[in-house]
UniProtKB/Swiss-Prot annotation:
The chain crosses the membrane at residues 40-56. One of its GO terms (biological process) is negative regulation of ERK1 and ERK2 cascade. The modification N-acetylalanine is found at A2. Highly expressed in ileocecal tissue and endometrium. This is Protein C3orf33. PANTHER family: PROTEIN C3ORF33. Disulfide bonds: none annotated.
């Protein structure tokens, strides 16, 4: 009796045989359409980057203070802009967002400018004249968000002076005796940079006071400064160990008080790095961190 014919192969063997064929066909198709595959990959990468940038608002153009996320101000993000004009109320700056050629060609950017004020600085008339001379129309600059009040933004202004270096206009004005320090409006007491900002502004002002620059040429101005310092900054200096060691000895005598301030500021180092390359990197890191926690 003849036996039944042997099976030609098991189902698992057929399946294993088909898998290499499918992979080979896909690989062959990809080789035959290499340009199409590259274009698809590039398109997907660009789409992903565009979605990421839009989600953290890197490509958004801000035309008013209400457009800026509260988180940006809380994190003191640095933005780039172009000066339009200087008015009695402050500087009108057109925000320049990060743009991609594809996005820029497809959409129309909104028109408008931000009202920016020098944080912690009360400009003298000579200071306003100096700003008009120093800043040119359409000049590019960076502004670091420190606080907001109504439609005005209180910022650090940084202007490139060639190469990778920038000048902090807030501190430069005080250093030249072209204005006086005031509390930065909108900057929270619990902010990490609250004390650093005010300390640097005071240090710049004391430099002008010591050299008798600008408004500090007259002794009467120096005396009024000391009175103002006592009334307006006592709360800030309570946070410093200097006052803790001196206790109630808060003398406003010109020589002794100035020497105490001088010794105190010699301890501190200027932590503000005005390298524009570093500012660009810090802005990107700030926004990436904002995206991660959002």
């Amino acid at each position: 009796m003849a036996g039944q014919p042997a099976a030609t192969g098991s189902p698992s063997a057929d399946k294993d045989g088909m898998e290499p064929n499918v992979v080979a066909r896909i690989s062959q198709w990809a080789d035959d359409h290499l340009r199409l595959v590259r274009n698809i990959s590039t398109g997907m990468a660009i789409a992903g980057i565009m979605l990421l940038l839009r989600s953290i608002r890197l490509t958004s153009k801000f035309t008013s203070s209400s457009d800026i996320p509260v988180e940006f101000i809380r994190r003191n993000v640095k933005l780039r802009g172009r000066l339009r004009r200087i008015t009695e109320n402050g500087l009108e700056i057109e925000h320049i967002p990060i743009t991609l050629p594809i996005i820029a060609s497809l959409r129309k950017e909104p028109r408008g400018a931000l009202l920016v004020k020098l944080a912690g600085v009360e400009l003298a008339e000579t200071g306003k004249a100096w700003l008009q001379k120093e800043l040119k129309p359409s000049q590019l600059l960076w502004f670091q968000l420190l606080g907001k009040e109504n439609s005005a933004l209180f910022c650090y202004l940084l202007v490139s002076k060639g190469g990778y270096f920038s000048v902090n206009l807030n501190e430069e004005i005080l250093r030249r005796g072209l204005g006086k320090t005031v509390l930065v409006k909108g900057l929270k007491y619990d902010s990490k940079i609250y004390w650093t900002v005010h300390r640097n502004l005071l240090k710049a002002e004391l430099t002008a006071l010591k050299k008798g620059e600008g408004i500090w040429k007259e002794d009467s101005e120096k005396e009024s400064y000391l009175e103002k310092f006592k009334d307006s900054w006592r709360e800030i200096w309570k946070k410093d160990s200097f006052l803790k060691t001196t206790g109630s000895d808060f003398s406003l005598k010109k020589e002794s008080y100035y020497e105490k301030l001088k010794r105190t500021y010699e301890i501190w180092k200027d932590n503000m790095n005005n390298c524009s390359l570093i500012l660009k990197f810090r802005e990107l890191i700030s926004r990436i961190n904002f995206r991660r926690k959002g």
